[in-house]
Amino acid sequence: MTLHSNSTTSPLFPNISSSWVHSPSEAGLPLGTVTQLGSYNISQETGNFSSNDTSSDPLGGHTIWQVVFIAFLTGFLALVTIIGNILVIVAFKVNKQLKTVNNYFLLSLACADLIIGVISMNLFTTYIIMNRWALGNLACDLWLSIDYVASNASVMNLLVISFDRYFSITRPLTYRAKRTTKRAGVMIGLAWVISFVLWAPAILFWQYFVGKRTVPPGECFIQFLSEPTITFGTAIAAFYMPVTIMTILYWRIYKETEKRTKELAGLQASGTEAEAENFVHPTGSSRSCSSYELQQQGVKRSSRRKYGRCHFWFTTKSWKPSAEQMDQDHSSSDSWNNNDAAASLENSASSDEEDIGSETRAIYSIVLKLPGHSSILNSTKLPSSDNLQVSNEDLGTVDVERNAHKLQAQKSMGDGDNCQKDFTKLPIQLESAVDTGKTSDTNSSADKTTATLPLSFKEATLAKRFALKTRSQITKRKRMSLIKEKKAAQTLSAILLAFIITWTPYNIMVLVNTFCDSCIPKTYWNLGYWLCYINSTVNPVCYALCNKTFRTTFKTLLLCQCDKRKRRKQQYQQRQSVIFHKRVPEQAL
């Protein structure tokens, strides 16, 4: 924000020297005497007139109703600005859900807006009403320093928010790993330090750099911005350039969000088609409890390989094998949810040398090398149980310890129609991974080993259902992530739009004043400068409109419902704790 030197100048008094048009001979005095007296009288009369004008009219030439209207309007806006930004700061303090990295930037922006509401708005209103600066040169320089540092910090914070949103969407893996609160604090600190270094020293000490103060008494503006060309240059650096950068970044954010929305829609459609198969083999033939032979395809070993790792917690009551239950598990896709079990998925990259042991308690681990991420996204059919791949390195024998004894591996099922045992032994041909340097078929066949692991039809069915559940979880996580990104983008768009609307009129006048310094009335300068302040009033409204958490927290604070909210939160946590203990089996604790 650039305060133009003509925006609040005291009225000029032309034609003061018109009474001195007579020649020296008419006055009967020497030329030098008349000139000296005339000069003295002109300056004395001018000074007395100005002094009498300013001291006798503290309202600056305004009527009482004009003063009341200006004071009421600006005072109301200042009060709303102060209350709104205090609400943002307090909401960030009391609500842990708001303590995200993105909201740290909004907190910094709220602090800058609060400074403007407390100091800048009120002093500038006094300056407008009195039509002169009556607080002295030091107070003038301090006000301008605080005003410009806070305003520039707001712009810098908007730039930081824009870049943060842009990198979060375009580089989600690399940038978000480094996106911590500590790093956010460093960026916020840099924004404030840069703003302070750019404006405060120049405003406070420029008169000492040039050797004199050129700002007239009763006026308050930045001395080095008295030239329109310099004023326009600062407007380019402080407004036009940041707005251009933020607009470009927001456009890129919008395009990337639309692209990810389309990808998510395709992923959801793919998942729906896969679930519609209801675990029927692609050939159309139903499967019984016969044995399957699952053979792993030979793959090259890479330095790091990703596995889908799942952990199951089974209670004893949910594991009663019978023919009816086998049929029910085979035909119904909801039986997975009916079991008293919980599953958690984590995607982790493990090195080839990492040894993963299997649990021999009620909790046991199954490590399946599921299809790659890209294939999950692009394919519409999940692989059948024949195509399930098992890693020989990470999948050992699966041991399940029941209450009194361990389940023993059983032989393959015979010609009977019904399943009589819990598990059947399924031969699995496992091929150890081949080193990247060995590409010939001879070397590959030499490294192959064969192992037999206990695996039943029910295990294959559960694995397939887990694959579907995994896909559903991936889709859900992507959908939730996209929703959060859209909310953050909406908040950014609202803040950016408010910034452009409130700051553009004044900076357009700065551009016009460069070519025509008398084309813009003083009243327009005052309105344009005050409109820049209104941006600090609008920002908290943007947070509330675009963020439900901010909105509910504001409502809670305004209605003094903090205690009720804490009680509800404690009750919710207690209920969740009870549900968690019910789900986790006692032997797993």
Swiss-Prot record:
Phenotype upon changing residue 148 to A: Decreased affinity for acetylcholine
Pfam families: 7tm_1
Cell location: Cell membrane; Postsynaptic cell membrane; Basolateral cell membrane; Endoplasmic reticulum membrane
GO molecular function: acetylcholine binding; G protein-coupled acetylcholine receptor activity; G protein-coupled acetylcholine receptor binding; quaternary ammonium group binding
Side Cytoplasmic, residues: 91-103, 164-183, 252-490, 546-589
Region Disordered, residue ranges: 323-356
Biased composition (Low complexity): 333-344
Span of the annotated motif Basolateral sorting signal: 274-280
Residue positions the entry lists as glycosylated: 6, 15, 41, 48, 52
Membrane-related topology note: Multi-pass membrane protein
Phosphoserine PTM positions: 384
Annotated coiled-coil segments of the chain: none
PROSITE patterns (UniProt xref): G_PROTEIN_RECEP_F1_1 (PS00237), G_PROTEIN_RECEP_F1_2 (PS50262)
Membrane-spanning segments: 67-90, 104-129, 142-163, 184-205, 229-251, 491-513, 526-545
GO annotation, biological process: acetylcholine receptor signaling pathway; adenylate cyclase-inhibiting G protein-coupled acetylcholine receptor signaling pathway; calcium-mediated signaling; chemical synaptic transmission; G protein-coupled acetylcholine receptor signaling pathway; G protein-coupled receptor signaling pathway, coupled to cyclic nucleotide second messenger; ligand-gated ion channel signaling pathway; negative regulation of heart rate by acetylcholine
GO (cellular component) term, any one: axon terminus
Keyword field: Cell membrane, Disulfide bond, Endoplasmic reticulum, G-protein coupled receptor, Glycoprotein, Membrane, Phosphoprotein, Postsynaptic cell membrane, Receptor, Synapse, Transducer, Transmembrane, Transmembrane helix
Job description of the protein: The muscarinic acetylcholine receptor mediates various cellular responses, including inhibition of adenylate cyclase, breakdown of phosphoinositides and modulation of potassium channels through the action of G proteins. Primary transducing effect is Pi turnover.
Description of how the protein assembles with itself and partners: Homodimer; the dimers can form tetramers. Interacts with NALCN. Interacts with TMEM147.
Family listed: Belongs to the G-protein coupled receptor 1 family. Muscarinic acetylcholine receptor subfamily. CHRM3 sub-subfamily.
Annotated protein name in UniProt: Muscarinic acetylcholine receptor M3
Organism: Rattus norvegicus
Phylogenetic placement of the source organism: Eukaryota, Metazoa, Chordata, Craniata, Vertebrata
Gene responsible for this protein: Chrm3
